[in-house]
Each structure stands twice: as C-alpha cells, then as structure tokens.
Design a protein with these regions (language model features):
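Phosphate-binding/catalytic loop of phosphoryl-transfer enzymes
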Residues: 76-173
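Glycine-rich beta-strand-to-loop/alpha-helix junction loops that act as flexible
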Residues: 73-80, 122-124, 244-254
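ATP-binding/phosphotransfer module of carbohydrate and carboxylate kinases, centering on a glycine-rich
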Residues: 1-67, 110-116, 160-256
C-alpha cells in the first residue's frame, strides 16, 4: 500500500527528534524526546523512540492508526554495530515501511542532498560518515571507551584528568582545575565514586566551563581545546579523502 505520510527520526545520544510530513514534504508535526542510542541502552532507546512516534502523530492531529499509512526512516545512534542491527531486525513498529540506519548516515544525506560529501558529528560522542556517490563509509562511533575522538565526553574526561593532576600538584593549578575539583568537594575519592556511574553525557557536562575558561585565558583550558581541534582535524582529513567532497561539521561542539 502506498504510504500517505513520511516520518523521519534523528535519534542521537542526547536527544531524538521526529518530523512527520505528507508525501509532498509539507510538515505536519515535529517533536523531540530523550536519548536514543541503541548501543548504550537498547531498550530505553526504543522506548523513547516509540513514545516520540506516538507524540508526533498525536501532535499532527492524527489517530495513532495513521502510523499504518506511514513510511518511517529512523537514524539511530549505535545502529552501525552489527550485534545491534541483529536486534533491530525484530523491531516492528506498526508502520507501512521501515528503514533503520545510523544517525550519521541520515545526517550526511541531509547535509549534502545526496551528493558526495561527508559529515563529522561532534556532540556528546562523535562519528563520521562519507558518501562517495555509491556507498557510505563510517568512521568512529565505537563508544566512549574506544572512540569518540573530538567529542564533548572525551574533552570532559581530559579536563577532569587534568584537574586531578593539578589537585595532586603534578602540574600547575588553574582557575579551571580548581573549579572542576570544587564540583567534587576537592576529593579525588568523590570523583572516583562518580566515575562508576557517569555516562558520556555526564562527562560532557563540563564542556561549557572549559570554553568559558579558555575565553578567560586559562592555559589548561586552551590546551584542551587545541587537543580536541587536532582530533577533529585528523578525522576530517580522512573523511575528505573518502568522499572527495565537502565535509560538514555537526553537533553541539560544531556550533559557533
């Protein structure tokens, strides 16, 4: 059956967005929800996506049964992992058609209108995608422990490590390192206990403080941003070579 509606979902590690249109592309409704990383927390991510689907259909003034007349494309963080793809094969929302790809693939397609090019998403985590006109090549996206070069989570981790070094007088202190340690009552043990449950988003929460400190002339903060810029440059050079087209930077850290 020919679908009557088109639904796109951009599911990132911090939040997800949905947009419902008719077949002519006229927007009927748009909604946002919580994180939708199917690698980090598969069940919670799909619960969030399911709630978002219901919300955007309702906001369009349609009955939920309209989903059976809707073609759905979901770009979800973590959907590039093979084991996750196997689980997603059993996800069957009540829609007319379904395609699930990674969030970075839909970002690349949207940024360049289907033409050759690449994107590097630098938010809480990071991942790149290059489209050469025939196929996508993905770079990174292997999680906070192994990957996420240039990301907010990695920047936050470096900053807190630096703060701990300064606290123990291994390197000089600065306004930034003192400010960061103050959040843990200047206690390395408190910091250690926090790391047990800290998510990538938790690590990334100190990023605004780093930028503010760098603007104020804090040398440690400026060094941290230089390291992050070098990481981003490394990824961008490879993406440029893969796509032979322009590279778009996206995500929270790419915002001026």
């Amino acid at each position: 059956m020919q679908p009557h509606y088109l639904l796109g979902i951009d599911g990132g590690g911090t939040q997800c967005r949905a947009r419902l249109t008719d077949l002519q592309g006229r927007m009927l409704a748009e909604a946002t929800g919580g994180p939708a990383n199917v690698w980090s927390d598969y069940d919670a991510a799909l619960t969030c996506v399911g709630q978002l689907i219901d919300r955007v259909v309702s906001q369009a003034g349609l009955a939920l049964e309209a989903l059976t007349q809707t073609a759905l494309v979901a770009g979800l963080a973590g959907a590039n992992v093979t084991s996750v793809q196997a689980r997603l094969a059993s996800w069957q929302p009540a829609c007319a058609a379904l395609q699930v790809v990674s969030d970075v693939e839909i970002a690349c397609a949207g940024a360049h209108g289907g033409a050759p090019g690449a994107v590097f998403i630098i938010g809480t985590g990071s991942q790149g995608a290059a489209w050469d006109g025939d196929q996508f090549t993905l770079l990174g996206g292997w999680g906070f422990a192994l990957s996420d070069q240039g990301s907010g989570a990695e920047l936050g981790r470096r900053a807190l490590r630096l703060a701990l070094l300064a606290h123990e007088a291994i390197i000089t202190q600065s306004a930034l390192t003192r400010q960061l340690m103050a959040q843990f009552d200047h206690s390395p043990e408190t910091m250690l206990l926090w790391t047990r449950s800290a998510t990538p988003a938790d690590w990334a929460r100190v990023v605004p403080q780093i930028f503010a400190a760098a603007d104020a002339g804090d040398g440690h903060a400026q060094d941290l941003l230089h390291q992050t810029a070098a990481d981003i440059g490394l990824m961008v050079r490879r993406l440029t070579a893969l796509s032979s087209g322009p590279v778009a930077l996206m995500g929270g850290l790419a915002t001026p």
